[in-house]
Amino acid sequence: MALTIPRSQYVATYGPTVGDKVRLGDTDLWATIEQDFLTKGDECKFGGGKSVRDGMAQSSTSTRDNPNVLDFALTNVMIIDAKLGIIKADIGIRDGRIVGIGQAGNPDTMDNVTPNMIIGASTEVHNGAHLIATAGGIDTHIHWICPQQAQHAIENGITTMIGGGSGPADGTHATTCTPGKFNIERMFQACEALPVNIGFFGKGNCSMLEPLKEQVVAGALGLKIHEDWGATPAVIDAALKVADEMDVQVAIHTDTLNESGFLEDTMKAINGRVIHTFHTEGAGGGHAPDIIKAAMYPNVLPASTNPTRPFTVNTIDEHLDMLMVCHHLDKRVPEDVAFADSRIRPETIAAEDILHDMGVFSIMSSDSQAMGRVGEVVTRTWQTADKMKAQRGALGDEGNDNFRIKRYIAKYTINPAIAHGISQYVGSLEVGKLADIVLWKPQFFGVKPEFVMKKGFISFAKMGDPNASIPTPQPVFYRPMFGANAKANTESAVYFVSQASVDANIKAQYGIQKETLAVKGCRDVGKKDLVHNNATPEITVDPERYEVRVDGEHITCEPATKVPLAQRYFLF
């Protein structure tokens, strides 16, 4: 006989279900569950007097030799995902990959158990009833200035870091390039202990092909062109020729000073080939004042970096000082001051907010320690979304913010994965992908995860005093867990590399332990493939007033005087 209970009691026991609204942090963003995959009355819950026990929701007969038995079951969890939507389900993990989104349990005693989601004696279980699961974030603009960035990134929910550098050298301070085989090899060896997936850009600034090819063979997953090395048409053409031949992506920081041409000349050199543009608004660098127009082209995958996200009353002042440091400028040199002033434009930064909300800008990233904060990609994304809701209203949803939420989460999960040919491995919680999962309490969403899983094993978590009698006493702060230790770490994270380097067996050459996974399909994508962020309207910029127009309409917004997910979360 069925038992009817009040919705409030159900939510208190098993978490929200279809129609329930969940507030994200202290933002004004509300997510409503669209679909619930769980069978009412057969929910899996672990604990004293609960259902996950022998002969009930846990099978008594299934051994791990049965390929349908899970290694880890995350039960009753709310999922926010750019591809799956906003749903309620159990997540099944086996061999470090997601094998099921559905109903876990014991098919001998329960109805509607997803066939490959059996809970057995070999299954670890975590109650997700009052948590939100998201895919691990992907940051595609990493200056590898110091290895400690990885810990700060994972503590904000970033599990994949793509960029370049070799430590605190001037070249790395300014550009995201790991130049040449020697440096690439050393960086692979140096990053074995880091708890995140990693990919390196080779230096793309060369007008001849062979010096570029050898870096791809050495393990670069792509090439980075930067104006400080000379972003000339010849360099752009050469890098894209190599990328087309070897199936890797090209990222570009274009020519702020317009030394070798204007935006139109750069687009002519690109010649319709796919390219990933960094800080496409321009404050981080790029053709002044109209690099923002690049976002209208169907072959351009446009990204932002987080120091301009969102536009606030402090943005302009902060940027001038950052720029002087990162690009080795001198306030006593008039030309250097003019260079800085040309890049920092309130009008285009304001427009960037709106272009994100319209789905014209597709990717969010950090620019770590080089005019960006590596531990704030996720936070800045949701601050931007909240600011846009306050200033522009709803995006056509009926009583919730689901579409806006899916648009914004795509910017740091699936879209950077698509841009760099790794979406078959990461970027969403779809079946078959690496179990890189971030768990959040709703009130801390976007700021401080509960824990982060890498390939199905807990890597980092908020943890209390290890000498306490229970896990929760203060001081509570992020600590590396077993998944970030010793050989478990090298088994729980991967390197993303070129197919040419896999064929060259760099894993054996370099003596590295982490799995190397080849990027694929980098040259076949376009703006049309980016999830919820594929708009290509006509964009114009007034060369004197810097006003930005989209399809003829002037777009601008006021700077924020306060943002959510800020000081109240960082008192301690």
Swiss-Prot record:
Entry's EC annotation: 3.5.1.5
Binding site for substrate: 226
UniProt-annotated binding residues for Ni(2+) 2: 224, 253, 279
Pfam families recorded: Amidohydro_1, Urease_alpha
Residues binding Ni(2+) 1, per UniProt: 141, 143, 224, 367
Catalytic activity, reaction form: urea + 2 H2O + H(+) = hydrogencarbonate + 2 NH4(+)
PTM section of the record: Carboxylation allows a single lysine to coordinate two nickel ions.
Pathway where it operates: Nitrogen metabolism; urea degradation; CO(2) and NH(3) from urea (urease route): step 1/1
Biological processes annotated in GO: urea catabolic process
Cofactor binding annotation: Binds 2 nickel ions per subunit.
Keyword annotations from UniProtKB, A to Z: Cytoplasm, Hydrolase, Metal-binding, Nickel
CDD domains: Urease_alpha
Molecular-function annotations in GO: nickel cation binding; urease activity
InterPro entries: Amidohydro-rel, Metal-dep_hydrolase_composite, Metal_Hydrolase, Urease_alpha_N_dom, Urease_alpha_subunit, Urease_AS, Urease_asu, Urease_asu_c
EC class: hydrolase
Location(s) in or outside the cell: Cytoplasm
Cofactor(s) demanded: Ni cation
Positions carrying N6-carboxylysine: 224
Main location as per UniProt: cytoplasm
Any one annotated GO CC term: cytoplasm
Ranges for domain Urease: 136-572
Active site: 327
Family that this chain belongs to: Belongs to the metallo-dependent hydrolases superfamily. Urease alpha subunit family.
Quaternary assembly: Heterotrimer of UreA (gamma), UreB (beta) and UreC (alpha) subunits. Three heterotrimers associate to form the active enzyme.
Name used for this protein in its record: Urease subunit alpha
